[in-house]
Amino acid sequence: DILAAFRVTPQPGVPPEEAGAAVAAESSTGTWTTVWTDGLTSLDRYKGRCYHIEPVPGDPDQYICYVAYPLDLFEEGSXTNMFTSIVGNVFGFKALRVLRLEDLRIPVAYTKTFQGPPHGIQVERDKLNKYGRPLMGCTIKPKLGLSAKNYGRAVYECLRGGLDFTKDDENVNSQPFMRWRDRFLFCAEAIYKAQAETGEIKGHYLNATAGTCEEMMKRAIFARELGVPIVMHDYLTGGFTANTTLAHYCRDNGLLLHIHRAMHAVIDRQKNHGMHFRVLAKALRMSGGDHIHAGTVVGKLEGERDITLGFVDLLRDDYIEKDRSRGIYFTQDWVSLPGVIPVASGGIHVWHMPALTEIFGDDSVLQFGGGTLGHPWGNAPGAVANRVALEACVKARNEGRDLAAEGNVIIREACKWSPELSAACEVWKEIKFEFEAMDTLDK
């Protein structure tokens, strides 16, 4: 069975058992009345069952309801159908005040019907020939308004300075100021020029997201013909069907696939209603993607540390034990489905480097947009500053130093032999994003 954990807040007067049963029925075989065609099938075989209810500590009106869904309710290899069944209709149910899907347990039999990520973590490292450290990226800013040639120039400067990747912003598709084909050509030129100068393999996440699947595939095919290593997709706005289609193409044609989660906070930010990002992360691993944005813990975007580390493990590891202290409701066995690299992006800069290196480890992408392009000396020095800071943190960690305790000291030591890093440290020494997370663990 597929197991689901729902956070249920019933309407006043509705007992939790009735609310849990309603969720199970409405998201499987049930309807609002008895119908004569019920007698033509075996409802006992197909209906969802609410098998356990537990109160939420500190909130007498909320319950965690566990529902089991028989596997025959779902089409094989279709994240689209899985979500249509489990969350498609039930969230508008009048007997519930609010409802949130906290986690899913995907059984091995269903997991094996998915291709998963096009390549996975180890294959990506082998393609890029980069080992022993996090990868580094940069979102090109301003996100909208640059011409294709100026955009390509910014890409070149960042890659030349020492970054591994640069990135289209999620809303860069094919607008009047910069059509997709022009952007692809200038970015490819920038990649090849930077590779020739540095001797390192470089990439730019070329956003293939489009208004139709056919147009999306046309862009991905053009990227492959240019010989670039990676393309990008906005998987929530583009949809799971489009994403799985693109992931299959990427595996067949040797392209890495970077996934942006634009629109996720509409679904996952409120603690009481919607769907937790760990569910969206699991679905992405099944649908397919080699990278996905996963918050930063320390930057400008929402993300509590324990929760973030919980779904980072769900993205990367083969087997994850149930651990409610990190928000993981079920043990999950991925049976060798390739892992996804989490991307830390959003309001981060060189002073965050020790914390990011400690939190995310080597199998991650640390992405500095403003933290690269905002450098007072320009894009390339901004890239140099980030690369030097990362190398210093990795070296210190490998020597056994405590990044959490000595992080600032490590960065200041590196400043002595990198004027670019010293300038960056001066610019961002006062920048902090200290707000309490909306989505927190139950205490």
Swiss-Prot record:
List, from the UniProt record, the residues annotated as the active site of this protein.
141 (proton acceptor), 260 (proton acceptor)
Q: Specify the enzyme's EC class, one word.
A: lyase
**Bound cofactor: record note:** Binds 1 Mg(2+) ion per subunit.
Which amino acids does the record list as binding Mg(2+)? 167, 169-170
Where do the annotations place substrate binding? 89, 139, 143, 261, 293, 345
The keyword Kinase is assigned to this record? no
> EC number(s) per UniProt?
4.1.1.39
PTM comment: The disulfide bond which can form in the large chain dimeric partners within the hexadecamer appears to be associated with oxidative stress and protein turnover.
Keywords in alphabetical order? Calvin cycle, Carbon dioxide fixation, Chloroplast, Disulfide bond, Lyase, Magnesium, Metal-binding, Monooxygenase, Oxidoreductase, Photorespiration, Photosynthesis, Plastid
GO MF, any single term: monooxygenase activity
Can you tell me which family this protein belongs to?
A: Belongs to the RuBisCO large chain family. Type I subfamily.
| Primary role | RuBisCO catalyzes two reactions: the carboxylation of D-ribulose 1,5-bisphosphate, the primary event in carbon dioxide fixation, as well as the oxidative fragmentation of the pentose substrate in the photorespiration process. Both reactions occur simultaneously and in competition at the same active site.
PANTHER family referenced in this protein's UniProt entry, alphabetically? RIBULOSE BISPHOSPHATE CARBOXYLASE, RIBULOSE BISPHOSPHATE CARBOXYLASE LARGE CHAIN
Subunit details for this protein? Heterohexadecamer of 8 large chains and 8 small chains; disulfide-linked. The disulfide link is formed within the large subunit homodimers.
Name of the featured protein? Ribulose bisphosphate carboxylase large chain
**Species of origin:** Verbena bonariensis (Argentinian vervain)
